Amino acid sequence: MNKEMTHKKSNGIIEWIDYRLPIFSFFKHFSYYQTPKNLNYLWTLGSIAGIALVIQIITGVILAMHYTPHVDHAFESVERIMRNVNYGWLLRYTHTVGASMFFATIYLHIARGLYYGSYKTPRELLWHIGIIIFLIMMATAFMGYVLPWGQMSYWSATVITNLFSAIPLIGEPIVIWLCGGFSVDNPTLNRFFSLHYLFPFIIVALVILHLLALHQHGSNNPKGIDVKSTKDTIPFHPYYTVKDFVGFGVYFIIFAYFIFYEPNYLGHPDNYIPANPLVTPAHIVPEWYFRPFYAILRAVPSKLAGVFLMFGSIFVLFLLPWLDTSKIRSGNYRPIYRIAFWIFMADCLFLGYLGSKPPAEPYIIISRFSACYYFCHFLVVLPLIGKYEKPLPLPNEL
């Protein structure tokens, strides 16, 4: 009897709250949210990216409690976190490795969208919000890379901020505004720390918009055809929550391996040397997730042209819904596009390799060919394939 009264009382409280703030209805919606019944494990990447973002925010907030954004103390404060803060080494490695894992997840998420045509109507805005999230992620990661104030941090900040000086007329004022002076110094570090703390919460807001856009027309699927009836769908919970947990398990196994066995594998040893404005590293290398764009930047001798191509390589993704003229979404039914897609993937990986190499021959000339194909894929190959390709017959149902 007492248990029944307690249960009714708790239900009454939940109903009272839900009537005024429908948070319980919102979570209940996920139990009944209908999704295509044929989604594969690549569709767990969105949930994994959400987990990665939460990990980055939690570890970042705790690390910020112990970090000192000052050029004389930043490097020492990071070393203090590693040595004197309880589990500071774990927090830092979780945050740094987590950034790489986050980007790896997002790159796979984007690749899945490219292959299955998730950018096509009516999901153009969903795609655009995703690319905006990617851009802010890149800005956040770059600013975070500067914070340890090692040699690679300092000189990467110097190289990237000086890129804006290539813009005619307004370039120099932009550089001074970014740096807070005529060079990378204490004001730069303070600004980057402040923005690095702010941007993840902007990403959270954009993720909410991303989910709203996703729920408007539902998920795409491997066949790329629209849901025609309820027999083509199943509830998100428990069918896809179970699948997501399998993906989480694989993700955390890989994550744990890098944290505990290879925490510095994806970093650069020069960043364990305190920043010295008088000593330039022999080879300035960004983090691995920036290297394809870095290779495009260095592919041409003109600084302005390099900056234009580097930013253009990202902004061309915004035009993708209109550059791909095919009416078929999924690459499973587009034999020529499927070949072009894998060539493009290989080209992106090759650009990443070239971005890690010194700016000398033969890497420069090879970078030009690779960068040329990168843009040709979007501006030439996709429009032509969409016009002349004969797709395979689409199935009638999922």
From Swiss-Prot:
The record's free-text note on cofactor binding: Binds 2 heme b groups non-covalently.
Domain of life: Bacteria
Gene Ontology BP term (one): respiratory electron transport chain
Record-given protein name: Cytochrome b
Family per similarity comment: Belongs to the cytochrome b family.
One Pfam family in the UniProt entry: Cytochrom_B_C
Native organism taxonomy: Bacteria, Pseudomonadati, Pseudomonadota, Alphaproteobacteria, Rickettsiales
Subunit details: The main subunits of complex b-c1 are: cytochrome b, cytochrome c1 and the Rieske protein.
Membrane topology label: Multi-pass membrane protein
Other facts: Heme 1 (or BL or b562) is low-potential and absorbs at about 562 nm, and heme 2 (or BH or b566) is high-potential and absorbs at about 566 nm.
Protein localization: Cell membrane
Entry keyword set: Cell membrane, Electron transport, Heme, Iron, Membrane, Metal-binding, Respiratory chain, Transmembrane, Transmembrane helix, Transport
GO MF, one annotated term: metal ion binding
Transmembrane segments: 45-65, 97-117, 129-149, 164-184, 192-212, 245-265, 304-324, 335-355, 364-384
Function: Component of the ubiquinol-cytochrome c reductase complex (complex III or cytochrome b-c1 complex), which is a respiratory chain that generates an electrochemical potential coupled to ATP synthesis.
